[in-house]
Amino acid sequence: MTDYPNNIPAKLEIIKASEITPKEVRWLWYPYIPFGKVTLLQGDPGDGKSKLMLSLAALLSKGAPLPFADEDESGEPMTVIYQTTEDDADDTVVPRFNSAGGDGDRLIFIKEDEKSLTFGDDRIREAVEKYHAKLLILDPMSSYIGDTCSMNNANETRAEFNHLIAVAKDTGCTIVITAHMNKAKDTSPLYRTNGSIDIASAARSILAVTRTANKQNPAERYPSEENLRRGSAENRATQ
């Protein structure tokens, strides 16, 4: 879609449904994380959001099957971009990735020494296109949405998300953003997103990582899904 300055009327253009070729959603991890879309991964602090994404990144870097997939669902190794402000790469991120058996040549980081990365930073698109990345992880949302964006303002958050939505759509890259949940209890994960509810609306898929009641295995977690099939949810245990 062409962007026009607000003071210049836009030319009317229409397209008929008959002129649109329907296509199926492609999945990075069925039925949780689609290709070419923005996914929001939520959870309380310490519930394993970063560990989950690094484990998935390690499997993808080798072309190995993801959890709950059939053994014959392996694919080509993928390049993953991982950005985080919560853990250092040298003593936490890379050791975790290595311990999960990942290919270090396929996990890359955009350097933020001179300038912090934000949703609208052109370096994101440049890195995705240059290295043919299939997954970009931004951990956590509050560090990358931008200092000038109020997370409680729907207009501001939607504008920031639109940058990432465009990159995902244009390149086919999956973008996963991690976020801490608010303190509300006994409610849908949709309503535990920190900030404006429009954040949940902007994401195409929403996952919530929660602890299970299995005291014999405290490392067990549930990824709960509320996504392309809005209103439905699925829980499966993972390590």
Task: Identify the residue ranges that each predicted region occupies.
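Post-Walker A helix-loop "phosphate-sensing" segment adjacent to the P-loop in P-loop NTPases
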Residues: 59-77
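Phosphate-binding/switch region of NTP-binding enzymes
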Residues: 40-41, 46-51, 75, 80-83, ...
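Hydrophobic positions on the alpha1 helix immediately C-terminal to the Walker A/P-loop
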Residues: 52, 56
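Short gly/ser/thr-rich secondary-structure transition/capping motifs
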Residues: 20-26, 118, 187-191
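Conserved inter-motif catalytic segment of the P-loop NTP-binding fold
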Residues: 4-9, 24, 28, 45-47, ...
